[in-house]
């Protein structure tokens, strides 16, 4: 009996030891995992702090170098001012952007590099001179966005009510430069801008391409909107989306996409179509993005100034002319022959009534090259002999800003 009791006690103790070992093993495993996690976290946190310290050190160098660059740019601006040279030079900027693209080995994309340096150059110009950029307003139009894309956010911008006002403000010196739309990939030419290029003495010094993405803004949900306001072109460019999503809504054309958003009020059942910039500036909720029917909707804008700029090496140029042809058979063919014989690439021909007499037209021609390049001067001389009007509108970088 005693032996059986001792055996039973032994078995209980032995079983308890086994359970204790199992429990101990689990606890040790848990401790090892915790220890491993703590070690990994400590190492990774140490690496993170080290990398942050490296970034801080790099930032310190960047700030010093940026200020050195700006100081050099300001000195250039002072010399330009003494020489009577314009502070803004899009061709020189294109040289800078091209050089940066060659230097950039990644991972930063070239578009990002261009955007960063666009702002660096803008800040430098702002310290050189208080430039004023006029544009077709109101604030937050696509023209405003194109102007900021071209000049950067640091300069002063002045919204103007109509395209003629932009030309007039630049002509009289109230604005240093003007930005106006010239054509859209779906709607065609902006005729008022074409007319004013002929009627005024301003010259084209740059072009800007802006991909137009329409958004729907409203203080109410899409299914509650009963009226949509926007510029007539924007309403047309979103026609299919509107018919599909707001078939009963009344479409109201007004003078500006930005104005449509600006006029929206909380509690109303109105919507407005405009670019994202308008929603940000006027603080109106976005109900739908990218509602345009065609995704390749691009508007081209021109930057106009009082003075033309000199040609620079390493920059691909586009030149714009306006011609008026004599009333003879084959007049247009003969004019275009001057370009083809010298291998000059025409990239645009646009006709527009001259408004001088019935059935008389101006021909707006764009071609690749600068007015001062070899061969192009000869073309211009030939055109002057065969055309009743040859007006140079500007040579400017072909690469869009």
Show the residue positions of the predicted features.
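A short, highly charged, low-complexity intrinsically disordered segment
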Residues: 7, 29, 400-401
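Coiled-coil-like amphipathic alpha-helices with heptad-repeat character
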Residues: 1, 21-27, 64
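Domain-level signature for soluble enzymes in the chorismate/prephenate branch of the shikimate pathway
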Residues: 37-401
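Short, often N-terminal, low-complexity regions
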Residues: 24, 34-37
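Aromatic (phenylalanine/tyrosine) cluster motif
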Residues: 10, 14-15, 20, 37, ...
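Polybasic, lysine-rich low-complexity intrinsically disordered segments
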Residues: 4, 30-33
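N-terminal amphipathic/hydrophobic targeting modules at extreme N-termini
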Residues: 2, 6-12, 16-17, 25
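Compositionally biased, intrinsically disordered low-complexity regions enriched in proline and serine
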Residues: 9, 15-16, 32, 118, ...
């Amino acid at each position: 009996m005693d032996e059986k009791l001792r055996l039973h006690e032994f078995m209980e103790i032995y079983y308890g030891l086994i359970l204790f070992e199992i429990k101990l093993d689990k606890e040790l495993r848990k401790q090892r995992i915790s220890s491993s996690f703590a070690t990994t976290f400590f190492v990774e946190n140490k690496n993170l702090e080290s990398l942050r310290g490296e970034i801080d050190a790099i930032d310190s160098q960047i700030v010093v170098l940026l200020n050195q660059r700006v100081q050099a740019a300001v000195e250039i601006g002072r010399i330009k001012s003494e020489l009577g040279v314009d502070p803004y030079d899009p061709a020189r900027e294109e040289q800078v952007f091209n050089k940066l693209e060659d230097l950039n080995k990644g991972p930063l994309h070239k578009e990002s590099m261009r955007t960063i340096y666009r702002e660096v150059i803008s800040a430098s110009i702002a310290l050189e001179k208080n430039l004023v950029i006029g544009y077709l307003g109101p604030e937050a139009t696509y023209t405003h966005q194109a102007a900021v894309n071209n000049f950067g956010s640091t300069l002063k911008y002045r919204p103007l009510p109509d395209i003629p006002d932009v030309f007039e403000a630049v002509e009289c010196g109230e604005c240093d430069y003007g930005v106006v739309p010239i054509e859209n990939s779906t709607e065609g030419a902006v005729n008022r801008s074409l007319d004013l290029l002929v009627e005024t003495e301003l010259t084209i010094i740059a072009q800007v391409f802006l991909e137009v993405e329409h958004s729907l803004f409203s203080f109410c949900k899409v299914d509650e909107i009963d009226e949509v306001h926007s510029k007539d072109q924007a309403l047309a460019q979103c026609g299919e989306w509107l018919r599909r999503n707001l078939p009963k809504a009344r479409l109201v054309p007004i003078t500006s996409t930005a104005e449509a958003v600006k006029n929206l009020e909380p509690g109303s059942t109105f919507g407005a179509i405009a670019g994202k910039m308008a929603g940000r500036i006027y603080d109106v909720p976005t109900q739908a993005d990218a509602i345009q029917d065609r995704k390749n909707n691009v508007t081209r804008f021109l930057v106009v100034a009082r003075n033309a700029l000199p040609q620079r090496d390493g920059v691909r140029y586009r030149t714009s002319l306006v011609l008026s042809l004599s009333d003879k058979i084959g007049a247009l063919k003969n004019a275009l022959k001057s370009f083809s014989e010298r291998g000059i690439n025409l990239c645009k021909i646009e006709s527009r009534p001259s408004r001088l007499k019935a059935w008389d037209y101006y021909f707006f021609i764009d071609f690749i090259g600068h007015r001062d390049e070899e061969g192009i001067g000869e073309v211009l001389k030939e055109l002057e002999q065969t055309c009743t009007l040859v007006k140079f509108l500007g040579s400017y970088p072909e690469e869009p800003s």
